[in-house]
Amino acid sequence: MILPGETVGIVGGGQLARMSALAARAMGYRVVVADPDPDCPAAPVADRVVVGALNDPDALAPLADVASVITYEWENIDVRVLERLAEKRPVQPKVDVLRTCQNRIYEKQALERLGIPVAPWRPVLSAEEFPAALEAIGLPAVLKTATMGYDGKGQAVIRTPEEADAAIAALAGPPLVLERLVPFACELSVVVARSASGEAAPFPVAENIHEHNILAYSIVPARVDAAVQAAARDLAVRIAEGLGLVGLLGVEMFCLPDGRLLVNELAPRPHNSGHYTQDACATSQFEQHIRAVCGLPLGAVDLLSPVCMVNVMGEDFPLNVGAALADPHVKLHLYGKREARPHRKMGHMNVLAPTAEEAFARARAAKAAIAGRR
């Protein structure tokens, strides 16, 4: 057990590290982050920044000299870095979990071994394998890079045979994953925490709405049947247990029109769709992550109020903060990024309301207000 007063190390210094660091410091921990940018978003709230590339084991080795436990804020990290750090300090979630989740082929193979439903898919390890995969999966389909995919990057939808060659060229070739494009009713996600003792705690189910392939809104509770919500949370727990997770896991799913669920992607870290927990749950996902990786008992995951999270993007700048906060139920969280660019996540708002529908409506209004569109 890592107790307050000791140091938590975080590989990566973006907004997830920033909010994890804030939660850790509130609990009395010291925090050291590792990032290539000495002025990364987490820097102002960390005790120290180890400056180095996230694919350079030597540059990040000093993190193990000061941290009692090490975690990471995203999955596209060179596993060699964490393997080196794990020689000296516990790394949670474990390197094997990261290795599985950062490669879509390994991820889908792991899900199938656990009996978790996924969309029909085929690995494409060479250009020669692509025609057979396309024939097996059929159209429409989506072609994805096996690695380095996030926020809609590394994906191409194929609706006609003519689009197939362009898709494989656009993604710079194998290794790739070809999936059937399923006609889903909505997209859901569950953030689940699991402790070293095996205790698992799934947060309430979020219903997610994307714009430009980037998460825009997370509505909680999700507007689906209670049975679907229970099934989603059960799937998340089964995956966490099957992976031997210690820490946090974001599980993205498709909900089909008949209520069946297909798991789409995994992220072994705090998740954008879990930001609502900061203001609407008994324990935030960030505090829960720190509890789990430090070996502490997990916190309660009760939903205290219906809520809608809305991302604040670079194209919303300059911000009209006063207009957005005119609704007293809007909670603003900005990440301290120096440059606002289109489609870059700059912050988020959590909007509380008596019902999920009202929270969604207020979130849309807050989004328009902060961007100066009303």
Predicted regions, residues:
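Peripheral (often C-terminal) accessory segments that flank ATP-dependent C-N-forming ligase machineries
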Residues: R291-R374
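Active-site nucleotide/adenylate-binding loops and adjacent lid/helix of ATP-dependent enzymes
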Residues: T100-S189, A193-H212, A216-G242, A363, ...
